[in-house]
């Protein structure tokens, strides 16, 4: 049944993308499993246990949000672990927040983009829906001056017809009072991040 819903959603997102509209999601009811896949920002580095954004999102939605954040993880390395998580949890929706460590390691932009594309396609092949959380293109210089989202996330969202949660993480990092350090939110920052993700998901039809 989920595969049939996925096919309908895929057709709808392709049509909406062709029309220049934000790709839409099918509703994810309370109690469903959602996988938050990412790095230390998903894990919750910079805040106390239980103050991460996946936990805050679970409280707002009634979903069972699995925190699959691994500090230091990259889009490249994430390819080797996502399938096992999909098999184990069988999520209805996967929220992918990853790429910052790839940028810090100065990996080529196109390589990061293709690794993210691989993650998206792996998710969608299982019948789950996917969304991307845009990440700033971090570097030692940008840690000082701040920067908006890396453009490759919007490009990839358009190419793969998936919603992109933009101007959330980068906006939090631009406000010192919401940061634990230069690249991690604090507890309030994670609450704001969960609220921003919630608003985007609601607009896209997941709620």
Describe the function of each predicted region.
Residues 3, 31-35, 188:
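Membrane-interface segments of envelope glycosyltransferases acting on lipid-linked substrates or membrane lipids
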Residues 6, 44, 65, 69, ...:
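A general structural-boundary detector
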Residues 15-18:
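C-terminal motif of bacterial Sec signal peptides marking the signal peptidase cleavage site
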Residues 20-75, 79-90:
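Serine-esterase "nucleophile elbow" of acetyl-processing enzymes
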């Amino acid at each position: 049944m989920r595969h049939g819903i996925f096919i309908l959603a895929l057709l709808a997102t392709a049509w909406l993308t062709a029309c220049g509209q934000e790709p839409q999601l099918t509703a994810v009811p309370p109690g469903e499993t959602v996988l938050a896949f990412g790095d230390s920002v998903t894990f919750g580095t910079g805040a106390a246990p239980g103050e991460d954004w996946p936990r805050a999102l679970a409280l707002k939605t009634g979903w069972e949000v699995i925190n699959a954040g691994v500090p230091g993880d990259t889009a490249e390395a994430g390819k080797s672990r996502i399938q096992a998580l999909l098999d184990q949890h069988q999520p209805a929706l996967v929220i992918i927040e990853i790429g910052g460590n790839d940028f810090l390691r100065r990996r080529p932009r196109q390589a990061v983009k293709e690794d993210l594309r691989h993650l998206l396609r792996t998710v969608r092949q299982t019948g789950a829906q996917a969304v991307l959380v845009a990440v700033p293109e971090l570097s030692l210089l940008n840690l000082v001056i701040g920067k908006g989202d890396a453009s490759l996330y919007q490009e990839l969202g358009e190419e793969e017809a998936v919603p992109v949660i933009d101007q959330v993480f980068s906006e939090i990092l631009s406000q010192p009072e919401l940061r634990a350090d230069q690249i991690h939110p604090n507890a309030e920052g994670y609450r704001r991040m969960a609220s921003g993700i919630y608003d985007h998901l609601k607009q896209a039809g997941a709620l």
